[in-house]
């Protein structure tokens, strides 16, 4: 690697593909391509069969036309053959299906045609209940259609220094060589939309913009969602879990940050192979008519309500501390969960700075610092506004994790409050520990955005004292958004949001649809 281009028929890549590992270990497999098999229908694969780009599948590069890699990986096997294999109990243990351009839903192809193609696959599977009862159908998309994604994807920083680009857990550092590319060696790939904006040089790869993935099986029925971080290597990791055949080309950073899809299924429960009968909708009167854009347009709205959600392997917290003597503000990342997690941090005082990126492996911690903006001589000016923070850092993580730290350096003789978060994984509740290491008391208010009807908790925090503030999250299914403010310190804010995992099923975020949360 790296694999930038499509190398069909010649000069193919040479590293080992996963079908080769299946073949070596006696696991049956086949790639279906060539269209539906109906006379006159398209037979291309829109170059979406990446096996064609490897020399071991290319007859022109010396591969035998009768080899299993060629006959099963780059030869036409249509949906008609797929249907026959299912009906006759010949479906391989692992199958890949590649659609022609007309059915791939790439612009200008129609989503309606893509839905038809998917339906042909599903109808073939459910027509044989024995096969369907032991099948997982994974529907992948490889692009996001050019839509804007507000979530910064997980990506390792280029450097490993405090107060710089971010940090990665030490046990993941050895894997990072696979996550960087020297773009100066590939000048043709430097084609930014904005001329001159590509910095070149060594750059991280990361996960890229989010794309949909649907898991259809007897173990995933019911409209469930799973918000663990996944990427395209997660599909291979799922096959690893199923067949115990490891793919060594997946590095440890990817394995830490990206799950293996097993969290999305209920393999411990009773599978439900039943097929729901959905009535055919009425034909729209506007079918085949030009689309009319309304004069007054509006943003699309989130679907109301919640969905059942799978339990996730996360237990993530962040906490802060101030070092007035050194002029540093520290944030401690703690991951006590069973999976790694990626975070990014934004500096509200310097919004032009790119976000810092962090990767914290399971059962590990990281700490990073920011220079306090008011640690210099300007702190001595009496005219300095009361609402003038010295730090303003926001942290984003997986599954709605968010924390916000804002405030000013406490002056001598003033209160110095700090807040830490603790999860009760047995009950799904959360507890805040409020500590005041300053020499004066302060009035503290804690508000939960998921409990708008409540006035919040009003607390008096004495000097050199500690308080515990408990929140029952049963009404919000373990979701919380707690803001801590101090009456006489308007710049002070500690905000913690996310979900408390219990190992049991829950719901999707009930605050996503609300305009207030």
Give residue ranges: language-model regions.
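N-terminal pro-sequences and low-complexity stem/linker regions of secreted or lumenal proteins
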Residues: 1-517
């Amino acid at each position: 690697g790296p694999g930038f281009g499509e190398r069909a028929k010649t000069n193919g890549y040479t590293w080992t593909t996963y079908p080769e590992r299946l073949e070596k270990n006696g696991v049956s497999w086949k790639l279906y391509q060539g269209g539906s098999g109906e006379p006159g229908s398209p037979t291309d694969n829109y170059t979406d069969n990446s096996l064609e780009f490897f020399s071991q599948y290319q007859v022109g590069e010396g591969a035998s036309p009768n080899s299993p890699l060629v006959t099963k990986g780059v030869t036409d096997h249509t949906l008609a053959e797929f249907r026959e294999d299912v009906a006759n109990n010949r479906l391989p243990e692992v199958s890949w299906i590649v659609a022609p351009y007309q059915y791939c839903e790439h612009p200008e192809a129609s989503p309606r045609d893509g839905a038809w193609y998917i339906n042909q696959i599903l109808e073939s599977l459910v027509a044989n209940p024995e096969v369907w009862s032991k099948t997982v159908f994974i529907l992948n998309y490889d692009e996001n259609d050019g839509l804007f994604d507000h979530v910064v994807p997980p990506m390792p920083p280029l450097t490993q220094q405090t107060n710089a680009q971010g940090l990665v857990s030490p046990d993941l550092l050895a894997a990072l060589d696979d996550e960087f590319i020297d773009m100066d060696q590939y000048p043709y790939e430097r084609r930014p939309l904005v001329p001159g904006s590509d910095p070149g040089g060594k750059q991280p790869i990361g996960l890229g913009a989010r794309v949909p993935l649907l898991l259809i099986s007897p173990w995933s029925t019911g409209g469930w969602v799973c918000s663990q971080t996944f990427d395209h290597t997660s599909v291979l990791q799922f096959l690893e879990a199923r067949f115990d055949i490891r793919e060594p080309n997946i590095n440890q950073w990817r394995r830490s940050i990206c799950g293996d899809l097993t969290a999305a299924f209920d393999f411990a429960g009773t599978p439900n192979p039943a097929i729901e009968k959905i009535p055919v909708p009425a034909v729209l009167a506007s079918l085949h008519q030009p689309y009319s854009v309304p004069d007054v347009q509006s943003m699309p709205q989130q679907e109301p309500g919640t969905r059942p959600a799978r339990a996730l392997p996360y237990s993530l917290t962040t906490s802060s501390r101030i070092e007035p003597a050194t002029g540093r503000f520290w944030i401690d990342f703690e991951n006590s969960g069973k999976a790694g997690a990626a975070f990014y941090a934004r500096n509200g005082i310097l919004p032009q700075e790119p976000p810092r990126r962090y990767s914290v492996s399971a059962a590990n911690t990281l700490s990073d610092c920011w220079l306090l903006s008011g640690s210099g001589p300007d702190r001595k000016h009496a005219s300095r506004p009361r609402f003038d923070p010295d730090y303003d850092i926001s942290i984003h993580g997986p599954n709605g994790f968010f924390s916000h730290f804002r405030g000013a350096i406490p002056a001598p003789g003033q209160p110095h409050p700090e807040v830490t978060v603790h999860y009760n994984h047995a009950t799904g509740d959360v507890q805040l520990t409020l500590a005041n290491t300053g020499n004066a008391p302060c009035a503290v208010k804690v508000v939960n955005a998921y409990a708008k009807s409540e006035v919040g908790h009003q607390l008096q925090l004495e000097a050199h004292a500690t308080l515990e503030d408990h929140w029952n999250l049963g009404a919000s299914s373990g979701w919380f958004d707690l803001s801590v403010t101090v009456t006489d310190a308007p710049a002070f804010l500690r905000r913690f949001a996310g979900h408390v995992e219990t190992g049991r099923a829950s719901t999707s975020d009930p605050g996503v649809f609300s305009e207030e949360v």
